[in-house]
């Protein structure tokens, strides 16, 4: 993409309404625009990042055996009355009527609808286990939306729902999602720590929040430093191997880790002082086993191997892709702007033509652009006639992993300057060497 043809509305000043780093940088870098309280438009560069996050989520959900569907945002109030949640749910749920005065709602979550889909088609234990997921925009009328897309009223959510014959099957479904989440966050470029979470009235031990450590986190968290050294499950993980999954979950839940709500001082005291990490954290995912909470009132049953009907045991698993984008910025930025992990960077590299109109600079910039595009690097070519300082500031702000600087002096020497955004290191390379280095990283 050429910057002269790209819609990138950069803000030079920090927006007054932005309270945290991610909100400020997303507005300044032209990723989003606020349309009303807690509701945002995603602009081209922001949407590219969001789509890359969703691609990784999809790949890992599919790898774990989940099936993607897409449910409507508008739901019937009747389904929610079946589960008993329609009257119990607070003002966060937006309730509407259609022209026939039928009561509808803008879905804040999808347990009822996915249970209705399941009970309409699945009759036998032979069709289990089953996991259905979708990625969908949701709306919750937050009393005080703040922090940009971190706590917005409209947000993108990946929610998955598992169906199993009994608790043992549901536990393994939970383990599959647990491991899938570890891989998802690692691929996005984040170090997420699973922490014990409140299970509510259902009880049990199957509820975890996935937390990344960040100074601007909303909650206080406590964990053993051992988590920082744990190896994330590899791409060769066999999601059909219950023993392997159990071993991974055991390793990732044995060291102490808890949010402030679940913090236990007695257990915390057992962690060596030098291994204690007390910090702020951001929730980026939540998985939860809720048994027959929805299958019982909604009659979601299957015939078991004993010939009898059994209520299915269910779980839900959520990741907010839009929130995850903001969390990645909170975890990786500096005073100049965003530092994107390579996997979700909007472009693979930025080419900075220091002197558009100069035959040499234009020629080298075009050669780099064509070579990197053909190699799948997806570069952004800054071909605009602006001051060098403004060009550098824009590239640092939008956080592309690598910048290739093309100037008259370097071109005369047959070289370009390559800058690593994260490390700040610069090196002069021959043009072919620069192309080879960047294509090798693609």
Swiss-Prot record:
It is an enzyme of class 6 (ligase). SUPFAM superfamilies: Class II aaRS ABD-related, Class II aaRS and biotin synthetases. Its EC number is 6.1.1.15. GO terms for cellular component: cytosol. It catalyses: tRNA(Pro) + L-proline + ATP = L-prolyl-tRNA(Pro) + AMP + diphosphate. GO terms for biological process: prolyl-tRNA aminoacylation. It holds the Pfam family tRNA-synt_2b. Gene3D superfamilies: Anticodon-binding domain, Bira Bifunctional Protein, Domain 2. Keywords: Aminoacyl-tRNA synthetase, ATP-binding, Cytoplasm, Ligase, Nucleotide-binding, Protein biosynthesis. It is found in: Cytoplasm. Catalyzes the attachment of proline to tRNA(Pro) in a two-step reaction: proline is first activated by ATP to form Pro-AMP and then transferred to the acceptor end of tRNA(Pro). HAMAP family: Pro_tRNA_synth_type2. PANTHER family: MITOCHONDRIAL RIBOSOME PROTEIN L39/PROLYL-TRNA LIGASE FAMILY MEMBER (PTHR42753), PROLINE--TRNA LIGASE (PTHR42753:SF2). Belongs to the class-II aminoacyl-tRNA synthetase family. ProS type 2 subfamily. Homodimer. This is Proline--tRNA ligase. It comes from Brucella canis (strain ATCC 23365 / NCTC 10854 / RM-666).
